[in-house]
Amino acid sequence: MSTPTTPLSYKDAGVDIDAGNALVNNIKSAVKRTRRPEVMGNLGGFGALCELPTKYKHPVLVSGTDGVGTKLRLAIDYKKHDNVGVDLVAMCSNDLIVSGAEPLFFLDYYATGKLDVEVATAVVKGIAEGCVQSGCALIGGETAEMPGMYEGDDYDLAGFCVGVVEKEEIIDGTKVQDGDALIALASSGPHSNGFSLIRKVLEVSKADPAQELAGKPLIDHLLEPTKIYVKSLLKLLEQHDVHAMSHITGGGFWENIPRVLPEDCKAVVKSDSWQWPVVFNWLMENGNISEFEMYRTFNCGVGMVVALPADKVDSALELLTAEGENAWLIGNIAKRNGEEEQVEIL
C-alpha cells in the first residue's frame, strides 16, 4: 500500500463543493419567485417545510414524480438547457391536476458527472419558471456531482411534486357517463414523450435538426417546452363539474384516456376536429410511422382531455379560451360493449 505524497481533497476526487455553492447563489432569486405563503423557512435546510392551505376542510395530499426522458439527450447535444426544467415541472404538475389537485411544492434532483454551473443554473431557472406557471413552490432539491457515473456533459433530472385537493372534490373518473363531452387542450409540441422514437427518426432520415419547418428550426419544434395546464384547469374546476381529465403522455391516446374511464365507457375521438401540428406530420412522414403508432406514442397536438357534461361545453370552451388555451370539442363518451377498446378514433 502506498500513501499519496500530497494531501487529497474532495475536489481531487471530482466533487467541487465550491461549484455547488456557486449554483445555489445563482438560483436564489429564481427560487424566491416561486414562494407560496405556506412555505416555512428558507432554501438550504435539511428538510423543507410547508403548511397546508387553510381553505381546505378535508385536505388530501396528491403526489407525483417524473423525469424528462430522452428529450434530455437532444437538449444536451444541442446545448438547449433552458426549457427542460419547465418540462420537468410540467410532467409532474399536469399529472396532479388530473385529480383536481392544486400543486403546492416541488423538489428536483439533478445528477451529473461534473457540475457545469452555467448549465445547471439554466436548468434550475427553468424549473423555477415551471413552478411559477404551476403556482407551486420550489422548496428544495438535490444536486449530485458523481464522477464516474455520467459521461462527459451528461446529466439527468427527476422531479417530485405534492399537491392538495378537497376530499369531496377528488376527480377519479367515477362520474364519467354515456353522453359526456370530451374537450381537448392543445399541446405545444411533443412535450416530453416519444423522444426515443423521435431520435430514431432523426437517425434513419439523416435529417438536419437545424432545417426550417414552418418558419422555425426543427429542433425548436422538438424541444418546445411542455405546456402547463394547471392554472387554467383550476379555473375550470371552480366553475364546472368536471368528470375526468387525462394527461396525454407516454402511451398517447390509447394508454392514457382509459386510465380515467369506467369499464363500461369508451371515448369516441373525432380525428377531423383538429389538425396535427406540423412537427407530428413531419415525424410520421420521415419515420414512416403508422397512424396507430403515432396515437400510441405521441400526443398528436392534444396535451389534455377533459370529460364533462355535454351541456357545459360552450361555457367551458369560453372559459378555457379566456385563460389562453386553444381548446375544442374533440369527441364524446359512449357506452362500451363487451371487449371493445376504450378509445375509438374516427
Swiss-Prot record:
Organism: Shewanella pealeana (strain ATCC 700345 / ANG-SQ1)
Gene3D superfamilies for this protein: PurM-like C-terminal domain, PurM-like, N-terminal domain
Pathway this chain belongs to: Purine metabolism; IMP biosynthesis via de novo pathway; 5-amino-1-(5-phospho-D-ribosyl)imidazole from N(2)-formyl-N(1)-(5-phospho-D-ribosyl)glycinamide: step 2/2
Family to which the UniProt record says this protein belongs: Belongs to the AIR synthase family.
Name of the molecule in the record: Phosphoribosylformylglycinamidine cyclo-ligase
Subcellular location: Cytoplasm
Its EC number(s): 6.3.3.1
CDD domains: PurM
GO BP, one annotated term: adenine biosynthetic process
Molecular functions (GO terms): ATP binding; phosphoribosylamine-glycine ligase activity; phosphoribosylformylglycinamidine cyclo-ligase activity
GO cellular component: cytosol
InterPro entries for the chain: PurM-like_C_dom (IPR010918), PurM-like_C_sf (IPR036676), PurM-like_N (IPR016188), PurM-like_N_sf (IPR036921), PurM_cligase (IPR004733)
UniProtKB keywords: ATP-binding, Cytoplasm, Ligase, Nucleotide-binding, Purine biosynthesis
Enzyme class name: ligase
Catalytic activity: 2-formamido-N(1)-(5-O-phospho-beta-D-ribosyl)acetamidine + ATP = 5-amino-1-(5-phospho-beta-D-ribosyl)imidazole + ADP + phosphate + H(+)
Pfam name, any one: AIRS_C
Family matches, as HAMAP family: AIRS
